C-alpha cells in the first residue's frame, strides 16, 4: 500500500459531509471582493457600493436558480445553523399566538433538534417523528401527527450522518393539503440532488456554503413569497434582507456561495455520476474482502457521497486511529467529540454494539479512483488486524449473542 505507487497524497480527505474543499473557481471569483471591490453593498451613493450590490444580487439569483426559487426569496445568513434557527424560531414567534405545534424528526441535525427543544421550554409542543430501520420517515405517521394546531413540519433533505434522502415531494404534498408550512434543512442536498422548492411545496429551506465547495461562514434561507411566509428575525438592526436578517452582508463570501451554486447547477449531473461510480467501487470492494460490514441507511434512496458503514466486532474510534491516512468521522462533525453512539443510528434501531462500530466515509467531486482503491486496501488490512485482537469478534465467531452478555461495567 505505497501511496507513491497510487500517485496520491496522504492523508486522503473523506469527510465531505463535515465540509468540502473550496473550488478554485470559487476562490478566484471571491478574491477581487477582498481587495479592490471592497465596497459596502448597502452604500447607495457611490460606485463602490453599487458594484458590491450588483455582485450580491447576481449571487442571490444563482442560489435561487439552483432550487427553482425567485431571487427575492433568498435571505443570506452566516450558515445553515443560523438559517435553521431563523426558520424554526422565526415561524414559532410569528405564528405562535395562533398555533402551538411543530413536527420534526428524531434524526434531524443537532441545530434543528436544539432549536425545537428551546421552543419546548417556551411552551411550543414538539412531535419528534420516528424513522424506519432504513432511516426514512413513515408518511402515515406524519399524516397522523398533524393537528389543527400544527404550524410547521421540519424535515431535512439528506441526512448528514447516513446520507438517506427523505421523500420531500410527498411530505410537501401532505403539508400543502393540510395547510402547514414545510421547512427543510437542505444543507447536505443543495447542489447534490435535484431540489425544486415549488415542485416539492417547500416553504423554507436552509442552505450552507461550505458543503458545496464554497466558503465557510455564509449560508442562506429560502423564504417563500407566494403565498407569503413571515418569520420574526433573530437579529435586529438596519433591516437588511427584507428585514429578516440585519447586518452588513459579507460580499466576498456571498459571491463565493453564488459561484459555488452556479458550478453545481452546471456540473451536478457529472459530479453525481463520478460520486456514484466511486461509491459502488468502494462498497463492493470492501464487501468482497471482509465480512460483517453493514451499510447504514437505505441503499437506493440516498446521496451516494455518503457511506456510513458498521464493521462488526471493532470499535469505531479504534478504526479511526488505525486508518489515520484517511480523514473520516465516526458521526456528525458537530457531535463526534462525544463518545456516545450516534443518535441517528440508535433511532434506526441499530444496537449499541453496531452503532459504536460505525464510520462515515465521504466521497466528493475531488475524490479519485486511486484514493478509493488505496482506502479500501488500508481499511480491509486494518479491520482484519483489529478483529484478530478483538475479544468481541472472537465471541461473535463462536456464535455468542453479544446482546445477552451482562457486562460488569461499561
Curated annotation (Swiss-Prot):
InterPro entries: Aminotrans_V_dom, Aminotrans_V_PyrdxlP_BS, Cys_deSase_IscS, Cysteine_dSase, PyrdxlP-dep_Trfase, PyrdxlP-dep_Trfase_major, PyrdxlP-dep_Trfase_small. Keywords: 2Fe-2S, Cytoplasm, Iron, Iron-sulfur, Metal-binding, Pyridoxal phosphate, Transferase. Homodimer. Forms a heterotetramer with IscU, interacts with other sulfur acceptors. The modification N6-(pyridoxal phosphate)lysine is found at residue 211. Pyridoxal 5'-phosphate binds at residues 80-81, 160, 188, 208-210, 248. [2Fe-2S] cluster binds at residue 334. Belongs to the class-V pyridoxal-phosphate-dependent aminotransferase family. NifS/IscS subfamily. The keyword Cytoplasm applies. This is Cysteine desulfurase IscS. Pathway: Cofactor biosynthesis; iron-sulfur cluster biosynthesis. One of its GO terms (biological process) is [2Fe-2S] cluster assembly. The active site is at 334 (cysteine persulfide intermediate). The keyword Metal-binding applies. It holds the Pfam family Aminotran_5. It is an enzyme of class 2 (transferase). It is found in: Cytoplasm. Disulfide bonds: none annotated. Master enzyme that delivers sulfur to a number of partners involved in Fe-S cluster assembly, tRNA modification or cofactor biosynthesis. Catalyzes the removal of elemental sulfur atoms from cysteine to produce alanine. Functions as a sulfur delivery protein for Fe-S cluster synthesis onto IscU, an Fe-S scaffold assembly protein, as well as other S acceptor proteins. GO terms for cellular component: L-cysteine desulfurase complex. Its EC number is 2.8.1.7. It catalyses: (sulfur carrier)-H + L-cysteine = (sulfur carrier)-SH + L-alanine. It comes from Rickettsia canadensis (strain McKiel). One of its GO terms (molecular function) is cysteine desulfurase activity. Its cofactor is pyridoxal 5'-phosphate. Its main location: cytoplasm.
Amino acid at each position: 500500500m505505497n501511496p507513491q505507487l497510487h500517485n496520491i497524497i496522504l492523508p486522503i480527505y473523506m469527510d465531505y459531509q463535515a465540509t468540502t474543499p473550496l473550488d478554485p473557481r470559487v476562490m478566484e471569483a471571491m478574491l477581487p471582493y477582498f481587495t479592490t471591490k471592497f465596497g459596502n453593498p448597502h452604500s447607495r451613493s457611490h460606485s463602490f457600493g453599487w458594484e458590491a450590490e450588483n455582485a450580491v444580487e447576481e449571487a442571490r439569483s444563482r442560489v435561487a436558480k439552483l432550487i427553482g426559487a425567485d431571487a427575492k426569496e433568498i435571505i443570506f445568513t452566516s450558515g445553515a445553523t443560523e438559517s435553521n434557527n431563523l426558520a424554526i424560531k422565526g415561524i414559532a414567534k410569528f405564528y405562535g399566538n395562533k398555533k402551538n405545534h411543530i413536527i420534526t424528526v428524531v434524526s434531524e441535525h443537532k441545530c434543528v433538534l436544539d432549536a425545537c427543544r428551546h421552543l419546548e421550554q417556551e411552551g411550543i409542543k414538539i412531535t419528534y417523528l420516528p424513522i424506519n430501520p432504513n432511516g426514512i420517515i413513515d408518511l402515515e405517521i406524519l399524516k397522523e401527527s398533524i393537528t389543527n394546531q400544527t404550524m410547521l413540519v421540519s424535515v431535512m433533505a439528506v441526512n448528514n450522518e447516513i446520507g438517506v434522502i427523505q421523500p420531500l415531494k410527498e411530505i410537501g404534498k401532505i403539508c400543502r393539503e393540510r395547510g402547514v408550512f414545510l421547512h427543510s434543512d437542505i444543507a447536505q442536498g443543495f447542489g447534490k440532488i435535484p431540489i425544486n422548492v415549488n415542485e416539492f411545496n417547500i416553504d423554507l429551506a436552509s442552505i450552507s456554503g461550505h458543503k458545496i465547495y464554497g466558503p465557510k461562514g455564509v449560508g442562506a434561507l429560502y423564504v417563500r413569497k407566494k403565498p407569503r411566509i413571515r418569520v420574526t428575525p433573530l437579529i435586529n438592526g438596519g433591516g437588511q434582507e427584507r428585514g429578516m436578517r440585519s447586518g452588513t452582508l459579507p460580499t466576498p463570501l456571498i459571491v463565493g456561495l453564488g459561484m459555488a451554486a452556479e458550478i453545481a447547477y452546471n456540473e451536478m449531473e457529472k459530479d453525481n455520476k463520478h460520486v456514484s461510480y466511486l461509491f459502488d467501487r468502494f462498497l463492493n470492494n470492501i464487501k468482497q474482502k471482509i465480512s460483517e460490514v453493514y451499510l447504514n441507511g437505505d441503499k437506493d434512496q440516498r446521496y451516494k457521497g455518503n457511506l456510513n458503514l458498521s464493521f462488526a466486532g471493532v470499535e469505531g474510534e479504534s478504526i479511526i486511529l488505525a486508518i489515520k491516512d484517511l480523514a473520516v468521522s465516526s458521526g456528525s462533525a458537530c457531535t463526534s467529540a462525544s463518545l456516545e453512539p450516534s443518535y441517528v443510528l440508535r433511532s434506526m434501531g441499530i444496537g449499541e454494539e453496531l452503532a459504536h462500530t460505525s464510520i462515515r466515509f465521504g466521497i466528493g467531486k475531488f475524490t479519485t479512483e486511486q484514493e478509493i482503491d488505496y482506502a479500501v486496501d488500508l481499511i480491509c488490512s486494518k479491520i482484519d488486524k483489529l478483529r484478530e485482537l478483538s475479544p468481541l469478534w472472537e465471541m461473535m465467531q463462536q456464535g455468542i449473542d453479544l446482546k445477552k452478555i451482562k457486562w460488569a461495567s461499561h
